[in-house]
Amino acid sequence: MDEESLAAALQTYRAQLEQVDLTLRAVTDPTQLEDLTQLHTDLQQLIELTESSLLSIQKCNLLTSLEGNPSLPFHEDPISLPALEVPTSLSSQDKEYEAFRMAISEESQPLGSNDETSTCSKGSEEEEEEEEEEEDNTSGMKVKAPYYSTWGTLEYHNAMVVGSEQMEDGEAGVRVLYLYPTHKAMKPCPFFLDGKCLFNDNCRFSHGQVVSVTELQPFKEADLGSLAVDSPCLAQHNDGIWYPARITDIESGFYTVKFDSLLLKESVLEADSIIPPLRGSDSSSSSSSDEEEDGAAEDSVYAKVLGQEIAGTTCSSEFGGWEAHTRGIGSKLLVRMGYEFGKGLGRNAEGRVEPIQAVVLPKGKSLDQCMEIQQRKKAGGKHKHKTSKRRPKASGQGGGAKARDIFDFLNEKLEGKFTSACTAETQKTGEKKGKELYNASKDSKRALSVQVAITAEKIKQKQREICHLKESLARNAGRESVISNQLEVRLSGARKELAGLQQEERSLQREQKKADTHKKMTEF
């Protein structure tokens, strides 16, 4: 609406308000009185709104007239302007309008006297307007900005530009807020954009990060089509941070995800709360040069994710075989951290998978002395091997020098076969018995220890039972003989069982000691 129509409407509303006031004075019915009061209030509000609209239009007309006629003397009577007619009855809005017009005329008077200053101010205003336009153009733009974490890694995240700033070295930069924060330090502060944050630089949330314009990359939309069941992703938690997770189920646009962290529960999310992981595989990159450069940049930032086709370091022995003698906590921790059995550690799975043999070195010796001892042992082993070959010759020569008679000849002929057979049989049985003892001590050492512990526990229980029976006999002394006889019978039986258990314990201990002694004598 224009100024004239608003002025006419304002007069009409005022006339209606006067009629309502007259009616309110004459009406006595409470129902009509309530309706008229509500109408009176509505008309007052409508008049206030119309006056404010009329005042704003008058201000705009005044400013446009000043811009269109800069040579107009501002000290003249403003009422002489044809487009600005002021009503005869001045209200509060009219007074405000008059004050505004006078202030504009006072501020604009120096401009007519000095043209050079006006041109300079116009030039500066134009530059400021251009800068504001550029800032408006960049503000709200979505880009891919770098993020330097506290532990020194460089990651590229999707972000939004909130303003242009200058870097410390004078280079052009922008302030960005990250759209998918993966850490608390990246999460935008909810009070920063409103200017109500009281912590400033000490805020634990992000007030935006200033990055160089040259480091920005084109924005990439999240491709939800690549997400499937059992594929990794980034999912938004209740705290607004995006955590790594894995999709377990997809049903009618809802994704059931299980977070990698054990502290976070499984949740069902919509498509806007889930994105593919930032560390995409190399196969997803297209053949265009720009995307290849982006892929190369991402590969330089992140470690490669090894696929199934990359062959790891082969292991000649069974991996983790040594854990048969332990609880296997090492492999469990490695599996929790994503390790795959049979592959080495490292970027290309080139790590060692063969276990390192433990070498026990003598105490109190330096490494040089240990190396000398090992070399002596090697040299001594060779020397012993040579001397052992020479020993039979010396024994043969010594045996040949002994004098022999007819009886030795006969004994050798008649008893030689029998004695040789007996000695061979005894040697075999001895070896067999020794092996059985060794194997038994090796395989059943734990079983023997368990059996000894069980027997000792039974002995303690039987001893407690005997103590209770003795106390019962002491209490029943001098009473009925039947109860005393039964207690004595039970006590004697318990003592026999205790003796048998003690004998069994001693035999088990002897077997255990025998196995330990045999092991000490056979293993060097």
Curated annotation (Swiss-Prot):
One of its GO terms (molecular function) is RNA polymerase II cis-regulatory region sequence-specific DNA binding. A zinc finger (C3H1-type) spans 184-210. Residues 376-393 have a biased composition (Basic residues). Pfam families: G-patch. Residues 125-137 have a biased composition (Acidic residues). GO terms for cellular component: nucleus. Keywords: DNA-binding, Metal-binding, Nucleus, Repressor, Transcription, Transcription regulation, Zinc, Zinc-finger. Residues 105-142, 279-298, 375-402, 500-524 are annotated as: Disordered. Residues 326-372 form the G-patch domain. Its main location: nucleus. Signal peptide: none annotated. SMART domains: G_patch, ZnF_C3H1. It is found in: Nucleus. Transcription repressor that specifically binds the 5'-GGAG[GA]A[GA]A-3' consensus sequence. Represses transcription by recruiting the chromatin multiprotein complex NuRD to target promoters. Negatively regulates expression of EGFR, a gene involved in cell proliferation, survival and migration. This is Zinc finger CCCH-type with G patch domain-containing protein.
